[in-house]
Amino acid sequence: MASFLRILGIETSCDETAAAIVERQDDGTAIVRSDVVLSQLDEHSAYGGVVPEIAARAHVEALDTLIDEALKRANVSLADVDAIAATSGPGLIGGLLVGLMTGKAISKATGKPLYAINHLEGHALTARLTDGLAFPYLMLLVSGGHTQLILVRGVGQYERWGTTIDDALGEAFDKTAKLLGLPYPGGPAVEAAAKKGNPDRFDLPRPLVGETRLDFSFSGLKTAVRLAATTIAPVSEQDIADICASFQKAVSRTLKDRIGRGLQRFKSEFPKTAEKPALVVAGGVAANLELRRTLQELCDLNGFRFIAPPLSLCTDNAVMIAWAGLERMATGAAPDGLDVQPRSRWPLDQKAETLLGHGKRGAKA
């Protein structure tokens, strides 16, 4: 009998098409046999953001080829995989349909079970793949579509402690870049400009700092950036750098307050964890070095491990989707039927209060 489970992962929730082959050993460790990702950056850059119809068509054109490439790199065939895991939400509905329907077709043709995976669960469980992290732990998800602080108790057991009430952090970066005439994607552009700027020139707001609830807000910060740029227009290259540096400083101070309160709550609820408590960061914004420095310092101050998976596993990828499927299989969870439907909105915490917050992919929960 095989001492491992092998799964094909498929990810098409936004503007990356991805496929991967991942194995889970009996001892819970993972082996990534292949990881193939095709970015649609060139297709969307002219529009300053992701265009859903263009994204869906690009997934249709690329996915079959990427799955073949993932199998080839892993030196396996579909007959050698034990199951298929495909993202079924949240995200852009057109892209989700492409990936999930492909997963269904493979499941039907091969008789292999299908697992419809929540994209956010993929992010939530990635640290167990990379670092063998034990439950429970905290995760900060920061991307173009999400800003959430989540308690991860176990596979399928998630509590949302905080979320954005308006813009997601990645969206705030992108909109700030657009306001200042910087290229898409905005996150890297703002970070690069900030390195040449004075973070103390503009006193930008730090939304919700001091409040006991753990939610986030970035819409007002984005508005303050616009007002600052308008006041000194026309802006020079140095002005742009100073605004970006001031923006990043405001974001860092905001996160320091919000996450710091979350770490204290975790310690009060779990005073005797077997291992050193951990904060995991995931999502494309996790690539920002200033953000990482802030979170590392915060964790050091509070006695937490800070875990930031490799960038390739922070942004959208199929490895995390495959791994989430393997984690579910290991718990004995039943596969999904072929009648499972994609969901543009699918909160991890089904009991959490619905808020008005939304990012690029629509309201989140």
Curated annotation (Swiss-Prot):
What the entry lists under InterPro entries is as follows: ATPase_NBD, Gcp-like_dom, KAE1/TsaD, TsaD
This entry's Enzyme Commission designation comes to: 2.3.1.234
Keyword Metal-binding listed: yes
Q: Where in the cell is it found?
A: Cytoplasm
Among its keywords, does the record have tRNA processing? yes
Q: Which UniProt keywords apply?
A: Acyltransferase, Cytoplasm, Iron, Metal-binding, Transferase, tRNA processing
Positions that bind substrate: L141, V142, S143, G144, G145, D174, G187, N288
| Biological process annotations from GO | tRNA threonylcarbamoyladenosine modification
Can you provide one Gene Ontology molecular function annotated for this UniProt record? N(6)-L-threonylcarbamoyladenine synthase activity
Q: Which reaction does it catalyse?
A: L-threonylcarbamoyladenylate + adenosine(37) in tRNA = N(6)-L-threonylcarbamoyladenosine(37) in tRNA + AMP + H(+)
Q: Which family does it belong to?
A: Belongs to the KAE1 / TsaD family.
Q: What is this protein called?
A: tRNA N6-adenosine threonylcarbamoyltransferase
Native organism is Rhizobium rhizogenes (strain K84 / ATCC BAA-868) (Agrobacterium radiobacter)
| Protein's gene | tsaD
